[in-house]
């Protein structure tokens, strides 16, 4: 597959391939693109296997448009939307290996339903603690 046209709308990067099929993926996967200005986003080049934004040093492969997980899970969305959270410290708090939690967040590994619920429950508990301060 080769993407021949791209555009941005809301929190998504869209791409159209050479057969006319449209794909989309969340900008949460691409922190630099997400925070880039419209002008910076327009300064890209197509390469052999992807798209490159030299000014912001970001790359998006053509194949990433066809990934099954182009949309972050609830767990991924939370952590990708809150980069201020120290993943290593949060992992230690819940008794988890920090590398494993990073792999869950980045989509390299998938947690079991039980593990995902446990992580989300701890996030909710911390949120309740913050709300108690209000």
Label the predicted regions.
Residues 1-134:
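Motif-centric detector for short Cys/His coordination patterns
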